[in-house]
């Protein structure tokens, strides 16, 4: 029945995304700092690693990570947080990223330019004879390469520092599948899970983040043909509608249909790789 009832599907998806009926920013800060501290200690590893873009998600996750390692050190556990800038050449909103770093106050800051590696991979694909439908498709592929190159860099640092990679995925992005599979979607821990966009903003403000970062227009900024394209432009609906949907509030039929469609077609992005034991298979003898 749930499959065909849009309101029931809304409730089911809200539960899937771990959206609680009640929200208290201070409680969520403590819950997520404790989670990060407990996870790192139990893993036996020493370092958290996170890419900082200058958006509210990485700003929030970064400050939570720094608070977690400071808590661990106060408890005599050796812990360290490395914040990494991962620009593609010159980033247009670099000033925002630097403001985020000043707010986060990470133990260590690194900068790794992904442009040479990302461009080299695109050139290698071109040399292989791979053809694209059009320039837009090539730009999209290049954008995904950038996201995955950032993942490679973060895991390289984590490998060198006995570290764990933090991801910034939250419920509003997750329900829409708005991340690159094995790119920004590749991480070990996701401390923002269970928060929609407005709640991430509320947590960031409770942490003391600058107002300009807390309310910055979100953009993945992966495509060169559409630089700084807002997330909401890609969705076709505003974050407020997605957040209302996740909080089980009334939304327009058009918004609900858009969210349900995105959720369905991006289902594979939220799952581990499928195996013959996960998926029904019909053989020629069936």
Curated annotation (Swiss-Prot):
It is an enzyme of class 6 (ligase). GO terms for molecular function: ATP binding; glutaminase activity; metal ion binding; NAD+ synthase (glutamine-hydrolyzing) activity; NAD+ synthase activity. Its EC number is 6.3.1.5. ATP binds at residues 51-58, 168, 197, 219. Mg(2+) binds at residues 57, 173. Keywords: ATP-binding, Ligase, Magnesium, Metal-binding, NAD, Nucleotide-binding. One of its GO terms (biological process) is NAD biosynthetic process. Deamido-NAD(+) binds at residues 148, 181, 188, 268-269. Pathway: Cofactor biosynthesis; NAD(+) biosynthesis; NAD(+) from deamido-NAD(+) (ammonia route): step 1/1. Catalyzes the ATP-dependent amidation of deamido-NAD to form NAD. Uses ammonia as a nitrogen source. HAMAP family: NadE_ammonia_dep. Homodimer. Belongs to the NAD synthetase family. This is NH(3)-dependent NAD(+) synthetase. It comes from Paraburkholderia phytofirmans (strain DSM 17436 / LMG 22146 / PsJN). The gene is nadE.
